[in-house]
Amino acid sequence: FTLDMGAAEGRPGMDFSPIAQLCREMEVPYTILGSEIQHIIFDVRKEKNPCSMCAKMRRGALHSALLERGIHKIALGHHYDDAVETFFMSLIFESRLSCFQPVTWLDRTQITQIRPLLYCGENLVRHTARRLSLPVVENPCPANGNTKRQEIKELIYELQGRYPGLKSRVFGSMQRLPLPEWGPVEHR
């Protein structure tokens, strides 16, 4: 499934045709779900910091689509850098030590979320996509590049330059915290 944030009544969405073509070639079922999330977030609510609300709405739309089809497991594309950024965001903006987990059971919806790329860095994901000539759809969000997550990404980059190995130590500390489902990994 792909959730198109802007495809709604009368409005064209993003161009996912390269991904749809790859899925056809690989004989993998592929469904694009239209939504009005972008319209609601930016036009109706005029959110200044849209990421949290958008994430909740996307999750709700995906979970509804899964349940309508009797599907109870989804693989999400979060990677190593996403996890470290999320950990920093939780610490700095929410005063808590928290991050999503490799495997999450959602009691209310009876859905299991898995994150198979969690131990792969963003650069590895980008390099692999280029090497395999995989189609990539760039983020069309109007807030892209001007978010708290982007600020944290830049902060981590700066800190990593001053303190080499910072990301791996933060990731390692996440594994040692009493966060269920986190465990050590020998190599990422």
Residue ranges and their predicted role:
Residues 1-85, 93, 123-131, 181:
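ATP-dependent adenylation/nucleotidyltransferase module used to activate substrates
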Residues 5, 35-37, 118, 141, ...:
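Residues that form or immediately flank small-molecule/cofactor binding pockets and catalytic motifs
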Residues 54-66, 103-109, 156, 160-175:
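Short, basic, helix/turn surface patches
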Residues 73-74, 81-158:
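Catalytic subdomain that performs nucleotidyl-dependent activation
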Residues 134-188:
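The feature marks non-catalytic terminal segments
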